[in-house]
Amino acid sequence: MCAAGLAAAAAQSVYAFSARQLAGGEPVSLGSLRCKGLLIENVASLUGTTVRDYTQMNEPQRRLGPRGLVVLGFPCNHSGHQENAKNEEILNSLKYVRPGGGFEPNFMLFEKGEVNGAGAHTLFAFLREALPAPSDDATALMIDPKLITWSPVCRNDVAWNFEKFLVGPDGVPLRRYSRRFQTIDIEPDIEALLSQGPSCA
């Protein structure tokens, strides 16, 4: 196990973790989302796919939120330094630059943090240990080694912005998707998950 995963090794589900929303306030315990299907993505506001990916993240939250889906975004600057804004600047960047046009995320957006390396948020250390590679691209790696800005480097690292993790209502990670697998294409998996009903009584 990579050292970054040791802190999260004892966890059985994502409900063991918490994070602070971008808007501030007290940390949100993911345990408060028990019995929901979760779609977790690492995001960046200056990526070449920011417009597509952020707008696609709004769609499942809008359509499937009433049925029990919660979409969570975690800004990170690891991949190409494409989230170099401060926490207080990110929402304005999304609203006026990319995607722009007054865009506002309708999903939970958390404070900027790390998804790889020794400083990785324990949630992402847990997700990476539970699902070591994207299901659609088991060989996914950072394309350009010069862009690796964290240490230690592990085989299960998140390779780029907008990797996705689908988590069941029991808090157990089910599937990981690469940056190339669009959020909109995950909807059949989400629909199938939600149609099973809660399994976390």
UniProtKB/Swiss-Prot annotation:
Top EC category: oxidoreductase
InterPro entries: Glutathione_peroxidase, GPX_AS, Thioredoxin-like_sf
Catalytic residues identified in the record: U47
Subcellular location field: Cytoplasm; Mitochondrion
EC number: 1.11.1.9, 1.11.1.12
Keyword Oxidoreductase part of the UniProt annotation: yes
Domain of life: Eukaryota
Transmembrane segments: none
Swiss-Prot/TrEMBL keywords: Acetylation, Cytoplasm, Lipid metabolism, Mitochondrion, Oxidoreductase, Peroxidase, Phosphoprotein, Selenocysteine
Phosphoserine modified-residue sites: S32, S195, S199
GO function term, MF aspect, one: glutathione peroxidase activity
Site, as annotated: Subject to oxidation and hydroselenide loss to dehydroalanine: U47
GO terms, biological process: arachidonate metabolic process; glutathione metabolic process; hydrogen peroxide catabolic process; lipoxygenase pathway; response to hydrogen peroxide; response to selenium ion
Principal subcellular localisation of the protein: cytoplasm
Residues modified to N6-succinyllysine: K86, K112, K146
GO CC annotations, alphabetized: cytosol; mitochondrion
Record's catalysed reaction(s): 2 glutathione + H2O2 = glutathione disulfide + 2 H2O; a hydroperoxy polyunsaturated fatty acid + 2 glutathione = a hydroxy polyunsaturated fatty acid + glutathione disulfide + H2O; tert-butyl hydroperoxide + 2 glutathione = tert-butanol + glutathione disulfide + H2O; cumene hydroperoxide + 2 glutathione = 2-phenylpropan-2-ol + glutathione disulfide + H2O
Record PTM N6-acetyllysine, positions in chain: K86, K112, K146
Mod. after translation: During periods of oxidative stress, Sec-47 may react with a superoxide radical, irreversibly lose hydroselenide and be converted to dehydroalanine.
Family per similarity comment: Belongs to the glutathione peroxidase family.
Function recorded in the entry: Catalyzes the reduction of hydroperoxides in a glutathione-dependent manner thus regulating cellular redox homeostasis. Can reduce small soluble hydroperoxides such as H2O2, cumene hydroperoxide and tert-butyl hydroperoxide, as well as several fatty acid-derived hydroperoxides. In platelets catalyzes the reduction of 12-hydroperoxyeicosatetraenoic acid, the primary product of the arachidonate 12-lipoxygenase pathway.
Subunit structure: Homotetramer. Interacts with MIEN1.
Record's protein name: Glutathione peroxidase 1
Organism of origin: Callithrix jacchus
Organism taxonomic ancestry: Eukaryota, Metazoa, Chordata, Craniata, Vertebrata
